């Protein structure tokens, strides 16, 4: 089984927010069952920016120290998630896909399809209400548990 986590789901997990427990249950089960977990390359870029910003605001004022800590955290992220990619043709497809009102969600959806994921796990299921669910099921973390 292959699971794709959108950016907000991963942020909730890393920041121990409202849905962190449900996501952790999924990740533990995924590890136990040898399921593959994916995030998009765009999510990885966003996480890099947000984690560094968070470190800066939480006492890591020294750039070298902050980057070292950032590298540790990102290495942990990469030990949990594979990276699903999209190519320029996919980007053009998303730009011209009027069924999505949020292009970033379309990129996430396309990355999940490219990785042949069975599930796209999101906190904003309404953002994917027009997505074709023939090949992928779109659910919230609590639905999966």
Model region roles, listed by residue range:
Residues 39-44, 122:
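Short beta-strand segments at enzyme active-site cores
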Residues 79-125:
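Active-site neighborhoods of divalent-metal-dependent phosphate/nucleic-acid chemistry enzymes
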